[in-house]
């Protein structure tokens, strides 16, 4: 029984790893994460700062949110995004460090 529950745990964990990896597999999403590492921003601000259309930025943000990397909150007509956890900043920083060294 313990082996079965351990297998379920590992399957869920590696499934989440894969979802995160897929979400990070796009350069625009990585840039959006870097912008959000500097603080909460609206979709409009993120689109402007990243050079994306509003629709394209929204699609990328949705993928990051579905992977659990960012969270959103609504403020009237505006949606603001932020990193879901400080560990997301560490992940982003680690990826940047590895990329700069390679």
Predicted regions and their residues:
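Amphipathic alpha-helical dimerization/coiled-coil segments
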Residues: 1-16, 34, 86-102
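N-terminal helix-turn-helix DNA-binding core of bacterial DNA-binding proteins
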Residues: 15-55, 74-87
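A generic alpha-helix structural signal
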Residues: 18-21, 61, 92
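Alpha-helical residues within the helix-turn-helix
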Residues: 48, 59, 65-66
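Short alpha-helical linear motifs
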Residues: 56-60, 99
């Amino acid at each position: 029984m313990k082996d079965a529950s351990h297998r379920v745990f590992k399957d869920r964990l590696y499934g989440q790893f894969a979802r995160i990896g897929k979400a990070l597999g796009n350069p625009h999403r990585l840039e959006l994460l870097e912008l959000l590492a500097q603080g909460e921003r609206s979709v409009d601000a993120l689109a402007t700062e990243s050079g994306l259309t509003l629709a394209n930025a929204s699609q990328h943000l949705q993928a990051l949110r579905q992977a659990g990397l960012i969270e959103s909150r609504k403020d009237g007509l505006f949606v603001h995004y932020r990193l879901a956890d400080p560990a997301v900043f560490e992940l982003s920083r680690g990826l940047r460090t590895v990329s700069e060294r390679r």
